[in-house]
Design a protein with these regions (language model features):
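Residues at the starts of beta-strands that form the adenosine-phosphate
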Residues: 4, 34-37, 74
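Short, glycine-rich nucleotide/cofactor-binding loops
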Residues: 6-20, 45-53
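Histidine-anchored nucleotide/phosphate-binding helix
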Residues: 19-38
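Short beta-alpha junction loops
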Residues: 41-46, 80-82
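A glycine-rich helix N-cap at a beta->alpha junction
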Residues: 54-81
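Short, well-ordered beta-strand core segments
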Residues: 75, 110-111
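Active-site regions of enzymes building and remodeling cell-envelope glycoconjugates
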Residues: 88-98
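An anion/phosphate-binding loop that grips the pyrophosphate of nucleotide cofactors and donors
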Residues: 107
Length: 113
């Protein structure tokens, strides 16, 4: 039975490899029958940004971004005072903390990185 899954990425992709790996996992979940949404908190929004030179594992990220775009994976980005600009060709909604909290609580399963 398909599940509603949230993949929450909260770590800075400039400091650890985990955000890119989390995005790869989300891609794998999306390829199946599950409804997968990726929630990017804080600096994790850099994964979808134009300036990716300082992201760890950028080669891996660049390999998976086309598939993420093609599958139209849904992203929710934390609405902060100084938002990180993301590429236009992703399916992105900016939401406040309370909306994100409610969304995560409504999921069947949540993976946090």
């Amino acid at each position: 039975m398909p599940k509603n899954i949230a993949v929450v990425i909260q770590e800075d992709p400039r400091k650890t490899h985990r955000p890119v790996e989390a995005l790869r996992i989300a891609l794998g979940l999306s390829a199946g029958s599950h409804m997968t949404t990726v929630v990017l908190l804080g600096e994790a929004a850099r994964l979808l940004g134009d300036e990716t030179d300082d992201i760890l594992d950028i080669e891996i990220l660049e390999k998976y971004l086309p598939a993420i775009k093609q599958l139209e994976i849904q992203f929710i980005i934390q609405d902060i005072h100084n938002p990180i600009e993301v590429q236009d060709d992703f399916s992105v909604k900016r939401e406040n903390d309370e909306t994100i909290r409610s969304f995560i609580q409504s999921m069947d399963c949540t993976l946090v990185f």
